[in-house]
Amino acid sequence: MGELLDKLERASRGAATPLGFASAVKREKIAPMLLLGALAAGDAAGAKLAVDGALDGAIVVGTGGAKKADVDRSVAALDGVTFGVWLDEAQPKAPDGADFQVFSSEATPAGALSGDERTTVMQVVPELDDSLLRTIEALPVDAFLVSLADAGSLTVRQLMRLARVRGVTSRWILVHVASLPTKEELEQLRDAGAGAVVVDLAGATAASLKATRELLLELPHGPTKRKKGRGVVTLLAAAAPASGPSRREPEPDEDDDDDDEP
């Protein structure tokens, strides 16, 4: 399992039970969602924030024709940080040191998704046609990314767009937002089934990232209690099991099939 998936698993489980006498052992505080920072390829200041800030990982954004040299420069600056690279199309081979890759294009060659040695995240547009949206659970990827960064703040419409994707998959969902979310917005994202919040590092400061990290650590792992009402049915539970979203299973070896033959 890659580092990103391992951190998502830990966040979904919460604090582990300490060994020894519980009263004498301090439990490690674990936030219910990860905090990831997105930096443009070649952004030296963003890379420094990713290294020095209170982040669970970073994403180097190399979409839109970014130069490979800029991507490589940012990758080299992220030593010691769990990071991935976001490109238009998934690549057969990830940059050295990258734990995961994110891709946006549906035209990505299927062969680029082969192999179990790395974590693959696909960006899904919530406005995708219903017939296609319902098929994403069958794709050989580990998680999905939903970008809500087209709006300055989290709105009801944005939550509806997120719920549209959450309702058709049990995989992890990373949510890209335009600005550092407030405590109330973090609660809404957690309740909507987000496993990680992706924030742009451009314009952010170490202090603002630390403050957001503290807000995450203060969040309970359970959902916010809803106002009592009639005719309310919760659908998200079917897509997001209490034990945490599922992840794709590796393909069985061909040798295993031979063992079953008489």
Description of each model-found segment:
Residues A31-L39, D56-G62, V81-D88, F100-S104, ...:
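Hydrophobic faces of well-ordered beta-strands that scaffold small-molecule active sites
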Residues A98, M122, E137-A143, L148, ...:
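ATP/nucleotide-binding catalytic cores
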Residues M1-V85, R247-P262:
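Conserved N-terminal beta1-alpha1 strand-loop-helix module at the mouth
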Residues V85-Q91, E127-T135, I173-H176, G222-L235:
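Short, basic, helix/turn surface patches
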Residues D72-S74, G203-P262:
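C-terminal helical cap(s) of enzyme catalytic domains, especially alpha/beta-barrels
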Residues A15-G20, G62-D79, E89-P92, F100-R118, ...:
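Active-site-adjacent beta->alpha loops and helix N-cap segments on the catalytic face
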Residues A45-A50, A90-G97, E127-A138, S179-V197:
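Catalytic cores of alpha/beta
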Residues A54-G57, V75-V85, D96-D99, D116-R118, ...:
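Structural alpha-beta junctions
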